[in-house]
């Protein structure tokens, strides 16, 4: 799958006239994509031309701290010949857009998959609007293309996606003919646990952050509970957000909730079975499915 014909020097992309295949690592700053980037920096994967992180502007501070650390490692002078630039792009502030009821283009939609009474769920547009599109726009910019310009036949892109073997069902082809999605961790036959083991061996004591928006409706009770106990300021911010999305806005006349129980987040009981005096016979495992 590796066909890197263009390499960068000193953190810059190669000259466009020499570039036929642009290798881009899609960086979610979660476990899999972080390990994928570090494996390249350690020489265990080919070197991509760049990595791109799409910022929703509402990630937990731990994600931004991790991204800063990751960037310092990957661009370190100690990694002679194995460094590559990390670009940060954004389509706007998903927190503000969700409250106002618009998406990144100003169209009136509830971009997050909020819950509503009557077993209704809003359309999930956030990944496409705030992750996929800004990365695609940056790729087109790196190819030297203007808005609406077609990708020349002599240029193509291989986009590295951090999906591991335990998530193989999430593998999808690119929607663009000029772009091919490739899955280095699948090729390496690495699971999420394998990624964690790789990271713990090389960076003992450092914790990999889970990458997801603070107020993602797909958070489970374990994650909400952890936020309430350990990041009270973030939890208070999300509670305030949850209250605001119940106010009618634009063309939405129904009440939305951030929690699947369809009750205010401030009133949800996140206690686990042990907290309630019962024995928990199961392990609740949270898997973030957005930023790998």
Residue ranges of predicted features:
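Nucleotide-activated chemistry modules centered on ATP-dependent adenylation/adenylyltransferase
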Residues: 2-5, 13-292
């Amino acid at each position: 799958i590796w066909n890197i014909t263009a390499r960068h020097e000193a953190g810059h992309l190669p000259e466009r006239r020499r570039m036929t295949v642009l290798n881009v690592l899609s960086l979610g700053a979660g476990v899999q994509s972080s390990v994928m980037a570090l494996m390249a920096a350690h020489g265990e994967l080919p070197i991509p031309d760049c990595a791109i992180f799409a910022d929703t502007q509402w990630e937990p501070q731990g994600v931004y701290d991790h991204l800063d650390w990751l960037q310092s490692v990957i661009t370190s002078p100690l990694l002679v010949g194995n460094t590559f630039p990390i670009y940060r792009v954004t389509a706007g502030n998903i927190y503000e857009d969700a409250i106002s009821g618009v998406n990144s283009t100003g169209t009136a939609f509830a971009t997050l998959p909020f819950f509503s009474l009557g077993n209704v769920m809003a359309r999930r547009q956030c990944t496409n609007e705030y992750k996929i599109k800004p990365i695609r726009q940056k790729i087109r910019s790196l190819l030297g293309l203007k808005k609406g310009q077609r990708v020349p036949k002599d240029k193509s892109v291989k986009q590295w996606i951090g999906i591991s073997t335990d998530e193989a069902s999430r593998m999808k082809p690119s929607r663009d003919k000029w772009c091919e999605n490739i899955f280095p961790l699948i090729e390496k036959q690495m699971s999420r646990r394998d990624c964690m083991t790789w990271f713990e061996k090389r960076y003992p004591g450092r914790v990999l952050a889970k990458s997801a928006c603070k107020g993602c409706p797909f958070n489970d009770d374990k994650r909400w509970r952890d936020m309430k106990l350990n990041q009270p300021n973030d939890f208070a911010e999300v509670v305030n957000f949850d209250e605001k999305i119940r106010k009618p806005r634009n063309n939405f006349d129904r009440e939305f909730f951030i929690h699947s129980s369809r009750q205010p987040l401030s009133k949800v009981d996140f206690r686990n079975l042990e907290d309630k005096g019962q024995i928990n016979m199961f392990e609740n495992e949270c898997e973030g499915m957005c930023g790998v």
